[in-house]
């Protein structure tokens, strides 16, 4: 009985956004600005999904994967912020639009929480890395290598909870948009500004939801990410492609139990680059136990010296990747805050002048 209920629920969710997707396709045909947005969005989303599909066989995320996801969220936020500012005069005059923009910014706060969790994990990695490079003498370095190897995973349960929160907030945003559109009268639906604004925010939110779903599947159900990456974008607007991707995603995910909740219950993000370093350390640890009985004599052992130097060299490369990812996360967080500040300030100015 439970399976039947679950199946009906999933079949229903697949039809939830059909009307909105068709409306988006129609708007895309009539508005050059939406067409331009659509082209950029389709290329960006396709690139992110393909990047996430890399390495799914080991259920891990590389730095390139995380950077691609962050970059896509950054770009989409910039696109939406630009449209909101371009339409500001019409937005301030219409309560429905105004509330919709507020909801969009509410969603962006959840995204900031996710980036804060990501930054905390990256900072933990950097601290352990610095201890190793600053180790004076082999005895101290060996101790720090062991501490690094035994350290807690940088992306813990908090990271997954924040990610789940971002996903849930994007879903909430889509549902809110759907309810708003159902309440609007026909005259408002024909207003060009509202159509452009709602179409672009809807598609940006839906694309983010799909990307988050594929990111989750990369860890919990690797074959889903691979299947979606192999899907060829159809000719036409992104609405058709996103609709197709979403249906494929739901079909692939059927029969699996609570994919997204399993992400942070007994599962963790295995950053591939970090695991490679830890594997090297483990191998070196085995060699050291066999060759070194007294840490004070480590300086005389050539193989140990070479092994430690090799790890330090790889750690330098790893450090650069961590720093680049942290910079990108900072950029996205700063951009979201800046867009919120600018738009909220203009809301205040518009209110004062009326």
Swiss-Prot record:
Compartment annotation: Membrane
Stored Pfam families: DUF677
Keyword Transmembrane helix recorded: yes
Coiled coil start-end: 270-341
Transmembrane segments: 200-220, 222-242
Keyword annotations of the record: Coiled coil, Membrane, Transmembrane, Transmembrane helix
Recorded topology in the membrane: Multi-pass membrane protein
GO cellular component: membrane
Principal location: membrane
Family per record: Belongs to the UPF0496 family.
PANTHER family noted in UniProt: UPF0496 PROTEIN 1, UPF0496 PROTEIN 3-RELATED
Protein name: UPF0496 protein At4g34330
Organism: Arabidopsis thaliana (Mouse-ear cress)
């Amino acid at each position: 009985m439970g399976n039947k209920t679950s199946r009906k629920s999933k079949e229903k969710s697949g039809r939830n956004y059909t009307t909105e997707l068709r409306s988006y396709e129609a708007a895309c045909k009539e508005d050059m600005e939406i067409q331009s947005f659509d082209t950029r969005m389709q290329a960006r989303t396709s690139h992110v999904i393909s990047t996430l599909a890399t390495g799914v066989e080991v259920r891990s995320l590389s730095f390139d994967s995380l950077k691609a996801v962050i970059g896509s969220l950054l770009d989409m936020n910039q696109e939406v912020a630009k449209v909101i500012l371009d339409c500001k005069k019409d937005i301030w005059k219409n309560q429905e639009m105004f509330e919709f923009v507020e909801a969009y910014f509410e969603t962006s706060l959840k995204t900031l929480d996710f980036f804060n969790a990501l930054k905390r994990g990256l900072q933990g990695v950097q601290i352990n890395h610095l201890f190793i490079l600053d180790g004076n003498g082999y005895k101290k370095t060996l101790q720090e290598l062991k501490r690094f190897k035994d350290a807690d995973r940088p992306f813990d349960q908090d990271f997954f909870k924040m990610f789940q929160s971002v996903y849930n907030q994007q879903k909430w945003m889509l549902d809110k948009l759907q309810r708003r559109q159902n309440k609007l009268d026909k005259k408002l639906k024909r207003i060009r500004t509202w159509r452009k604004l709602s179409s672009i925010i809807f598609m940006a939110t839906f694309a983010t939801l799909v990307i988050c779903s594929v990111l989750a599947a990369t860890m919990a159900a690797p074959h889903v990410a691979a299947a979606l990456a192999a899907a060829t974008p159809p000719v036409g607007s992104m609405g058709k492609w996103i609709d197709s991707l979403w249906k494929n995603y739901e079909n692939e995910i059927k029969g699996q139990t609570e994919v997204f909740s399993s992400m942070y219950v007994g599962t963790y993000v295995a950053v591939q680059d970090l695991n490679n370093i830890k594997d090297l350390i483990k191998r070196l640890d085995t060699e050291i136990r066999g060759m070194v009985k007294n840490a004070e004599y480590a300086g005389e052992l050539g193989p140990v010296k070479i092994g430690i130097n090799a790890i330090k060299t790889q750690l330098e490369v790893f450090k650069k990747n961590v720093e680049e990812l942290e910079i990108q996360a900072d950029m996205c967080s700063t951009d979201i805050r800046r867009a919120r500040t600018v738009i909220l300030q203009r809301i205040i100015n518009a209110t004062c002048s009326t």
